[in-house]
Amino acid sequence: MKKVLFALSFLFTTSLLFAQPREDMDTSWKNEYRETATKINNLIHTKLEVKPDFSKSYLYGKAWLTLKPHFYPTDSLNLDAKGMEIKKVALVKGTKQIPLTFDYDEWNLRIKLDKTYKSNESYTIYIDYTAKPDEFEEKYGGGAMLGIKGMYFINPKGEEKDKPSQIWTQGETESSSAWFPTIDKTNQRCTQELTVTVDNKYVTLSNGKLASQKKNADGTRSDYWKMDLPHAPYLFFLGVGDYAVVKDTWRGKEVNYYVEPEYKSVAKKIFGNTPEMMTFFSKITGVDFPWIKYSQITGRDYVAGAMENTTATIHQESAQQDARELVDGNIWEGTIAHELFHQWFGDYVTTESWSNLTLNESFANYSETLWNEYKYGKDASDEHNYQDMQGYLMSGSDKKDLVRFHYKDKEDMFDAVSYNKGGRILHMLRNHIGDSAFFKSINNYLTTNKFKSAEAHQLRLAFEEITGRDLNWYFNQWYFGSGNPTVDIDYVYDDAAGKATVIVKQTQKTDKIFKLPLAIDVYNGTEKVRYNVWANNAVDSFSINYTKRPDLINVDGDKIMLWTKCKDCTNKCRS
């Protein structure tokens, strides 16, 4: 997901949106370990038949969920089902439906199964329900960052003449269960069928392929969407509205852009780099775009910047720019790259818990740097990466681990640490081990964990397998630790001895000392000599011999380190 604050310019990012966080008086959450959700039952397949009611902002639904016990036998099923009216729960046996007893409290649907099932036995549950997302949000929404209602009816009665009537969904973090019953956890995944019945004037979009459409006698149409590859419930998507669909293609796969009709003529100017991005990302990951199609849709009043629903990304309306605005460049290009890369990192391989969110977001964040490097050159890439780093450094988040198991709310994980810092850490790792090893390692991570959930240790193991190096030090320092070094760099020249000494002092206000692989470049005229060194101590000194005093000594020659430098450094010379 691309949060609004990460889509804005560097100016606004640093001066407005990353203000110092307020001190939280409630600290009880610091003692609560956020463990990965226990798997009791595993989703296998979800089949939905839904019909939205614009007049009430309701969704009438029927769900068939196929599951099986993960390992231990069980005689019960606990589903997330938020703010619904549950009309019927039954076990499907051939053509028969056997009613089951259940308990429901507006959040969880607890079902007593007909028997104890073993891990090699699957079963299918039928649920007839009505989702009432607006009523649920009004009752329980509170101050949730993205809301909790999962499904958004935009101008449902057409009372706002300058706004289209739309429906779109937002599942992340755990709000898909506000429009269909499921096990709403990141470590679940299943295949999917969805049939949605809407007025014939509307266009629909969901995950997978539009397999069929049927016009009904009452002026409605039923669209049948089919997703044959498994993905997480929070990535399920449904969009409905009056859209122009602009068609593109990539290697025979559909690539479509859903925009409001007045933007039809410029849709390819906004989204048209998508096929080239798909080629580029397929090449660098070594994994061809894994899904059957890729569509992008805009949503009025969308609650974030964009969201990487599998095969069906949604963007906020700001993505829609007219021809005059596009003359100055496409402000949404980075977000388009970000969400597309999520189709690999987030959808193909999914974080197993919100604690490990950076496995999704750091790669999506770094994809913007990679795309800039490929498309516009190293200077553009370095500028983007530097701005991202500054966004983290100015966010006041230096006490947060990248992977953290203690947080007040899972929404708190969507911050400059998971995104910006995580992206910079990948950039440093790439520079440390080299391009070939880096991209082979991410290919190893993707292929080893495809259609599964993963945690940071699996990323480490993927890198270790390729490089042959123990990288625990790197992951312990950057993934499971907080902060960043602050350094004071000093230079002492002794012309008589023909020696320069570079002194690197770590001055961060913690006891933690960082292990830093550094490149020191020494310039004389057009000649550059690079020295690769390690700074492992509070103070490290590095001696460089010379016959002629260097014109420049440049520590961190490629400017890839995640650190801050003291402003009062002085150059000391003695002859």
Regions found by a protein language model. Give the residues of each.
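Non-catalytic accessory/interaction domains
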Residues: 170, 198, 203, 221, ...
